[in-house]
Design a protein with these regions (language model features):
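Bacterial N-terminal signal peptides
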Residues: 4-17
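Short, helix-capping/interhelical loops that line the mouth of catalytic, cofactor-
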Residues: 21-43, 87-149, 178-190
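Short, contiguous alpha-helical
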Residues: 45-49, 53-56, 66-105, 144-190
Length: 190
């Protein structure tokens, strides 16, 4: 009986393998994800929205009396960081989007938290507006930058995200020194 079962199994295996090949050959392939139009600009915009959200949340979460905080005398205060980001957003996003930065009332890092946070939010709204027009066909274009130099649009985009990451980590450290959790350390819904 064992011999019959073993012989049947051996005889049946090639047929089983052939059936599997036929089934997999006729089965519909898994649908590939649709290609993203302008993958570089799209990725940049998605990153800009997330990092902007984190930076604005950090500014919202830092108590007003801590906007003058700086870990050492040589460092920027938290208010300096918020103001620097707002000014940088207007210049960098305007440059990337090929638009002049809006003319805004001059602020100081010592202005109130409400004033500084409102300005930061205005500048991220400006970034969202102008970055919506950027596409991958113009990444190689030379743009005017600091000190009369030029950089490609792609390089300015990279510089911008690096600046945001730098100042988000700086803000997160300032928050932790003051016993606060930065936005990215909080559990969702907390």
């Amino acid at each position: 009986m064992r011999t019959i079962l073993l012989t049947s199994a051996i005889a049946f295996l090639p047929a089983l393998a052939a059936a599997q090949q036929t089934t997999s050959a006729t089965a519909a392939p898994a649908a590939a994800p649709a290609p993203v139009a302008n993958p570089v600009a799209t990725a940049f915009r998605e990153n800009a929205k997330q990092v902007g959200k984190n930076l604005m949340a950090a500014a919202d979460d830092m108590p007003a009396d801590k906007f003058s905080f700086k870990p050492t005398p040589a460092q920027m205060s938290f208010g300096d960081i918020v103001l620097h980001l707002a000014q940088g957003n207007d210049f960098l996003c305007g440059t990337i989007g090929g638009q002049k930065a809006p003319q805004r009332t001059k602020l100081a890092a010592t202005d109130s938290k409400d004033v500084l946070v409102a300005r930061l939010k205005e500048t991220f709204a400006f970034c969202d507006q102008v970055l919506a027009t950027v596409d991958d066909t113009k990444l190689q274009e030379q743009l005017p930058m600091f000190g009369g130099r030029t950089m490609t649009r792609a390089a300015v985009m990279t510089l911008t995200t690096a600046d945001w990451a730098d100042h988000y980590s700086q803000s997160a450290i300032y928050m932790r020194i003051n016993g606060l959790l930065p936005p990215t350390a909080k559990r969702p819904g907390a």
